[in-house]
Amino acid sequence: MNLIPTVIEQTNRGERAYDIYSRLLKDRIIMLGSAIDDNVANSIVSQLLFLEAEDPEKDISIYINSPGGSITAGMAIYDTMQFIKPKVSTICIGMAASMGAFLLAAGEKGKRYALPNSEVMIHQPLGGAQGQATEIEIAAKRILSLRDKLNQVLAERTGQPIEVIERDTDRDNFKTAEEALQYGLIDKVLTRNTEEQK
């Protein structure tokens, strides 16, 4: 059962009820709190585009608590984050794993955060193939190409040499918030909610 809290806001016209995500969106906060698939990506991309149309000069914050998911869906979010004019701040709450970690690192440099007890996990893309040998070969080439693309972006975002990224993403690589900071995946470990991150 998926319960979504409702908040009541008093206005001069009376009361207005919002689901919590719509209320957060008014403050330019987007929640990524699930596995990343096409539906989640479409929702995040739509919110980013909406907030850009509302005010292209004001920052957007994405709070991430995600085990990762589809590479193509994640890349749709990544490309939109880079495409829109507002700066996109990313904040890890809980866990940012796989594509979740990639999106965390994709935030505006200087505005990528994690809470003290959150974890970040990077690894190489997962995939499988079945069918004829040629189909398996095509799938293998594609996943290797995706791995190279993701590693290149991570190297650019973290400042780590590509060889270090390749080595460190070979297997599941878990990092504390402090370790993610040292690695360059984030820019600061947050202990208090301050205006500095907005």
Swiss-Prot record:
GO cellular component assignments: cytoplasm; endopeptidase Clp complex
Gene3D superfamilies with a match to the protein in the record: 2-enoyl-CoA Hydratase, Chain A, domain 1 (3.90.226.10)
Query: Keywords in UniProt for this one?
Result: Cytoplasm, Hydrolase, Protease, Serine protease
* GO terms, biological process: protein quality control for misfolded or incompletely synthesized proteins
Gene Ontology terms for molecular function: ATP-dependent peptidase activity; ATPase binding; serine-type endopeptidase activity
What InterPro entries does UniProt report for this protein, alphabetically?
ClpP, ClpP/crotonase-like_dom_sf, ClpP/TepA, ClpP_His_AS, ClpP_Ser_AS
Q: Where in the cell is it found?
A: Cytoplasm
E.C. number: 3.4.21.92
A UniProt-annotated Pfam family: CLP_protease
Q: Where along the chain is the active site annotated? A: S98, H123
Indicate the enzyme's highest-level EC class. hydrolase
Task: Name the catalysed reactions.
Answer: Hydrolysis of proteins to small peptides in the presence of ATP and magnesium. alpha-casein is the usual test substrate. In the absence of ATP, only oligopeptides shorter than five residues are hydrolyzed (such as succinyl-Leu-Tyr-|-NHMec, and Leu-Tyr-Leu-|-Tyr-Trp, in which cleavage of the -Tyr-|-Leu- and -Tyr-|-Trp bonds also occurs)
Q: Which HAMAP family match?
A: ClpP
Purpose of the protein: Cleaves peptides in various proteins in a process that requires ATP hydrolysis. Has a chymotrypsin-like activity. Plays a major role in the degradation of misfolded proteins.
Summarize the subunit comment. Fourteen ClpP subunits assemble into 2 heptameric rings which stack back to back to give a disk-like structure with a central cavity, resembling the structure of eukaryotic proteasomes.
Q: Which PANTHER family match?
A: ATP-DEPENDENT CLP PROTEASE PROTEOLYTIC SUBUNIT
Q: Would you identify the family this protein belongs to, as annotated? A: Belongs to the peptidase S14 family.
This protein is called ATP-dependent Clp protease proteolytic subunit
Q: Which organism is it from?
A: Bacillus pumilus (strain SAFR-032)
